[in-house]
C-alpha cells in the first residue's frame, strides 16, 4: 500500500508542478525504490535518491548465455554521487539491484552479514606475457577464506594478503582461459574460470593443509538452506548467471559470495559480494533474483 501511495504521489507532484506526466519506466523505478525502502534495503545515509536515467536494454547472446528478453535498467543518484541501480523485466519483476553503502541489514524482510572482504578480480601474467583475469571462482573463494581468517578458530586460514589468497586457491584448480571476445573487460585481459566442485575441493585441501577444522560441501540452490547458513553467521559461495553492471547488455556465469537474503513484494533475492563490481562505496551488497542462483558451496567450522 505504501509503495503504491508513494508512486502515486510521485505522479501527482509532477502534475502539480506543471511537468509532463512521468514516463511509465520512471514511475516503475520509483515504485521499486519505495518497495526496497519499505523492506529496509535503502540506507538512510543516502538521503534523497533520484532516478537519474532509465534505459531499455537488449541483452546480447554470448558463448555462455542465449539472448534474453529486453529489460529496464535505472541509474540512481544522491547528493554524494552514484546511489545504485535497479533492473526489472517488462512485466515489472525486479531482477537485480544495489544501493550504495548497504553492507549489512536486519529487518523483518531482509538479513545480511557484514565482514566479507570485497576482493576484486585482478590481472595476472600468462605464460605468453599477456594479461589474464584472476577469475571469479578463486577470487570469490579468497573472499570467503579472508572472512574466516578474521575469526577465532579459523585464523590460520589467512595469507600474506588478499591477492596471495587468490593465487593460492587458483593454484589448486584447473583454470580455463578464454579470450575476451564479448568485451567483458574491454579486451584488457583474457577471462578465466573453473567449476564449483573444484573450488570446494580446493577450499577443503587448503583448509586441511593449514589445520583449519572446517567441512566444505556442495549443494543445489535451496532457499531454506541458504537462509539457515546466513542466520548461523556463515557466508555461502554461489554459482549464478548475472548481468554485468557496467555493461548490463552482457550476462555471464559467475561465482560470488552470498551474504544476504531478502523478500520484496513476494519475490526472493540473494545479496552477494561481487568480485567484478566496483560500487562507489566498497562492500555494498548487490542483490539478484534467486532464480539466477544454481549451486552453493558451504563452509562450516566443525566446532
Residue ranges and their predicted role:
Residues 10, 141, 200-203:
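Generic structural marker for isolated residues within well-ordered, non-membrane alpha-helices
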Residues 20-83, 89-91, 97, 101, ...:
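Conserved active-site-adjacent core of cysteine acyl-enzyme catalytic domains
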Residues 74, 93-115, 119:
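Non-catalytic propeptide/linker segments at domain boundaries
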Residues 1-6:
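Positively charged n-region of N-terminal signal peptides that target proteins for export
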Residues 15-19, 147:
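Short hydrophobic alpha-helical membrane-anchoring segments
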Residues 25, 120-168:
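Active-site nucleophile-adjacent alpha helix/oxyanion-hole segment immediately C-terminal to the catalytic cysteine
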Residues 7-16:
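Bacterial N-terminal signal peptides
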Amino acid at each position: 500500500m505504501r509503495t503504491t501511495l508513494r508512486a502515486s504521489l510521485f505522479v501527482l507532484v509532477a502534475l502539480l508542478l506543471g511537468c509532463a506526466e512521468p514516463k511509465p519506466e520512471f514511475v516503475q523505478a520509483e515504485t521499486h525504490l519505495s518497495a526496497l525502502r519499505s523492506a529496509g534495503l535503502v540506507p538512510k545515509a543516502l538521503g534523497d535518491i533520484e532516478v537519474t536515467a532509465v534505459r531499455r536494454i537488449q541483452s546480447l547472446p554470448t558463448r555462455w548465455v542465449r539472448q534474453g528478453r529486453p529489460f529496464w535498467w535505472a541509474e540512481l543518484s544522491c547528493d554524494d554521487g552514484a546511489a545504485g541501480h535497479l533492473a526489472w523485466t517488462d512485466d515489472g519483476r525486479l531482477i537485480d539491484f544495489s544501493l550504495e553503502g548497504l553492507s549489512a541489514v536486519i529487518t523483518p524482510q531482509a538479513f545480511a552479514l557484514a565482514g566479507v572482504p570485497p576482493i576484486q578480480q585482478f590481472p595476472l601474467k600468462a605464460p605468453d606475457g599477456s594479461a589474464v583475469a584472476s577469475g571469479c571462482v578463486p577470487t570469490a573463494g579468497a573472499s570467503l577464506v579472508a572472512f574466516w581468517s578474521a575469526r577465532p578458530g579459523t585464523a590460520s586460514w589467512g595469507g600474506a594478503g588478499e591477492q596471495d589468497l587468490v593465487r593460492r586457491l587458483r593454484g589448486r584448480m584447473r583454470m580455463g582461459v578464454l579470450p575476451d571476445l564479448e568485451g567483458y573487460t574491454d579486451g584488457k585481459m583474457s577471462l578465466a574460470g573453473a567449476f564449483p566442485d573444484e573450488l570446494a575441493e580446493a577450499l577443503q585441501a587448503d583448509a586441511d593443509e593449514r589445520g583449519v577444522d572446517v567441512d566444505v560441501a556442495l549443494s543445489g540452490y535451496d532457499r531454506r538452506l541458504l537462509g539457515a547458513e546466513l542466520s548461523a553467521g556463515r557466508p555461502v559461495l554461489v554459482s549464478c548467471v548475472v548481468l554485468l553492471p557496467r555493461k548490463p547488455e552482457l550476462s555471464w556465469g559467475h561465482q560470488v559470495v552470498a551474504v544476504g537474503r531478502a523478500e520484496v513484494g513476494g519475490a526472493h533475492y540473494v545479496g552477494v559480494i561481487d568480485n567484478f563490481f566496483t560500487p562507489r562505496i566498497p562492500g555494498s551488497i548487490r542483490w539478484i533474483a534467486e532464480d539466477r542462483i544454481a549451486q552453493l558451496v558451504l563452509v562450516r567450522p566443525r566446532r
